[in-house]
Amino acid sequence: MSVPSSVIENHLVPKEIPVYRLNARESFNLLTEKEQLYAHHISVACWWGSKICLGQTSIESGPIFNLFQNLFSIQNLKSTVVPNIVSEEEYSDLLSYAATFYGNMGNYLSFGDSKFIPRISKEKLQLIINKVNDNKVNEYWGKCSELMYSLDKQVRELGIDGNGISTYYSPNITKVEIEKVQKFMDSKSISPYNTRLFKVSENNYNLLIASASTSTPTVSHQFDGYTINIVYGDWNKNLTKVVDNLKLALPYAANENQTNMLKKYIDSFYSGSIDDHKDSQRWWIKDISPAVETNIGFIESYRDPYGVRGEWEGFVSMVNKEMSLKFGKLTDNATTFLSKLPWDKSFEKEKFNKPDFTSLEVLTFATTGIPAGINLSNYDDIRQTEGFKNVSLGNVIAARKDEYVTFIQESDQKLFNELSTEAFELQVGIHELYGHGSGKLFTTDANGNVNFKVGEVINPLTNKPIDPKTEVYKFGETYDSVFKSLGSPMEECRAECCGIYLSPDEKILELFGFTDPKKAEDVYYVNWLIMARAGVCALEFYSPPSEGAPGKWRQAHMQARYCILTTFLRSGIVTLDKTADDVIVKLDKSKIRGIGVKAVGDFLNRLMVYKATANIDASIKLFDEYTHVNEEFLAIRDIVLAKKKPRKVFVQAHTYLNSNGKVCLQDFDDSTQGMIDSMITRFGKDDSDML
């Protein structure tokens, strides 16, 4: 069946890819020799682990990666094929695809989960393959050429149950089966973060656990008519390289916390134990303001269509001391600002474990996409009772250039470009610390005891006491296991709402250095404008109903931002001016501190109560209402798609040891060729870890 040209165009890699270099040299040079060695070895571990992302994205991503590692390692490739085999433009299209692929560590966008295909035709790429006539190139081209270009309906997006593909699951499994196995896992307190689930035969399933070790015997369990086999050794070749390089970092740890953290990482990745990984996070949160900050593992569940399994990521970074001082002040005043959030103190943890909050310059972020900020650990039991860390990734946030901004008024263009970086730093800071770092979950322990005073804590939405039977997380349940695929968009919405709710606060603005009233007002105005515009742009990440399949949001943050746009529109602080080919966001600055803050606060309170009380049914109803895309917004979506711009990809530095054992840092051009060069330098043609 032929694919409509409009569909093909939506999935073609853009001709121009915005490539930015993550500048880390200045911060790296300030490290001691020992710190540089520590950073280097963990960086190598992160990168080798990142090849797991290829297999977590699609079955063809691994062969595509190896195809490019071999193809672009060929000397004088461009002069060999241009202009005799392909044109300059066609070769540039190939570079754009390869850079986008490397930037996403797979052939599906990390932000949006939709497949992208080369703009250079398959026939022309075949001519390049024929010309170089390399055995490895031919081998990997044979393994990936069909799927690389396929836009069959089933493979256009990530998903399950016939609505996309996912390598976290076998193609023959249903959501009902996944849910049943999840109930088994909850009953045994087995974390899904480092697992995949494959159906072997009727009522027979392999639960794969990621581990370097393959010697742990398979154990079979019977559960409600299912046979569930727990099989260790998933991603064993990749994790063996991770473990080997983490061991090399051990002699260069700065303190006991780092040593113990590394040992627990090694134990976890070798054995597959999530409990060991939890212990690594306990040591990590105790390692306050290290010169080299790092974390590694199966962390975020955004890309699991079911919402519980973690994607590999690892980062290494250096502290930006000047910006970290601002975040430190935010942390020091946490008690004051948490009390300003729109819920009763009984919905807040009894003790706020003051987190480490630093601004970092990223040396390495090895995964499918780089965030602007992070709040870890993601383990609820650690975050709720022991603490967490916040980081803002300064050189990621700062990687932008002045440009014409779509969907805002001409009168806002100059202000938006001038203040968007500062406004975004403010939003990220509040989002991570007071968003992800706030709130309490009402839970039940193994003995049936709850963590609140029965009869005294009132649900503000019902004005009745919290029910210790129905409004709590049962023992073994977690936020992710209860909220599943809704968990990420709901939590991102809650954190984003905290950011915009508190950003007009004078005291917070002063902490960030915005003491001039006019500039302070402009900063929070731009912050709210960024959010309103993001709600419009979010429509790019919505797939409308098609051939019986329901509409689907493909990105948690963007679903959250559309939800917030709905809140803005309902309150009247935002209006949309629509024409045949454009839509303009108009935000009433005079209403932000009054009507706007109240509307966001009321909505935020609902999110917090639903999260605290494990109320998944009310949450589904709320999100169905606030993120429904009607005919009016489907028309706006067409405008958004016509004006969409590709997301930036980041070229990262490479570290290596010279003949004297010193760490050297190599930078690359901020171009598609620079992105390719960085990956060829980093990995070469080593495919020994590919399954």
From Swiss-Prot:
Enzymatic reactions: Release of an N-terminal dipeptide from a peptide comprising four or more residues, with broad specificity. Also acts on dipeptidyl 2-naphthylamides
Gene Ontology CC: cytoplasm
Location of this chain's protein in the cell: Cytoplasm
GO molecular function (one): dipeptidyl-peptidase activity
Entry keyword Acetylation: no
GO BP term (any one): proteolysis
Mitochondrion in keyword set: no
Active site residues according to the UniProt entry: E432
Principal localisation: cytoplasm
Cofactor note: Binds 1 zinc ion per subunit.
Disulfide bonds: none
Keywords (A to Z) from UniProt: Aminopeptidase, Cytoplasm, Hydrolase, Metal-binding, Metalloprotease, Protease, Zinc
Binding site for Zn(2+): H431, H436, E492
EC number(s) per entry: 3.4.14.4
Required co-factors: Zn(2+)
Family under the similarity heading: Belongs to the peptidase M49 family.
Record protein name field: Dipeptidyl peptidase 3
Protein species of origin: Dictyostelium discoideum (Social amoeba)
Gene that encodes the chain: dpp3-1
